[in-house]
Amino acid sequence: HQSLLCTVKDRSVSPPRFKVKEIFLEENQKVKTFNLSPSIAEPDISKGYANMSEPNVNFRDDYILYNYPIESHLYKIDLNTGSGKMYKADSDYTSNKAQKCKSKTDYTEWQRHGFENPHFFDIMYLPTCDMYARLHVDAIDFGKNENLELLSRERDFYLCLFDNELNKIKEIKLPINTFNPYTGWCQIHDGRSEE
């Protein structure tokens, strides 16, 4: 079948819930809705986590893969059965959960919060290796007069690899000053960039 998958935030409930809707291109099929499990580390990420308050969601074959920027666990939902599973994916090097932000409205505090906590990025499937990868950055001290550009490039950066069943294989600390912190991540076919 052909369908579109999209993530939505349901604000009609408290705390807000996240869902994935599968919209079929065939007219006679109803929309399917899959409820994402809340973060096991913090069931309500809508309050106190600044810019880390929504899940990272990806799709692979018949699965929804997601995680939360504030914590290290991974989650998977089977699109055929609707059943979900959580996977422990702790870092060996960093804290596995972000602390709450001190302010709900002060953007300076939001920036500080973003630097002084780990941030877990989305889980990506690497088809040529039949495995998964997740990147995350560690917390770093944030001074009031710091150059944010330099500070963002000096954070410790980690790659965590998982087999095709989401079992952790290895975690590697990557060199600092070798990545752009202001972009989304993606995998490339053979591991080489074409310029």
Predicted regions and their residues:
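Structural signature of eukaryotic scaffold interfaces centered on beta-propeller domains
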Residues: 1, 48-60, 115-129, 184-192
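Conserved small/polar residues in nucleotide/adenosyl-binding loops
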Residues: 195
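Loop/turn-rich, solvent-exposed surfaces of beta-rich toroidal or solenoidal domains
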Residues: 114-164, 168
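Beta-propeller blade signature
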Residues: 15-29, 72-77, 148-167
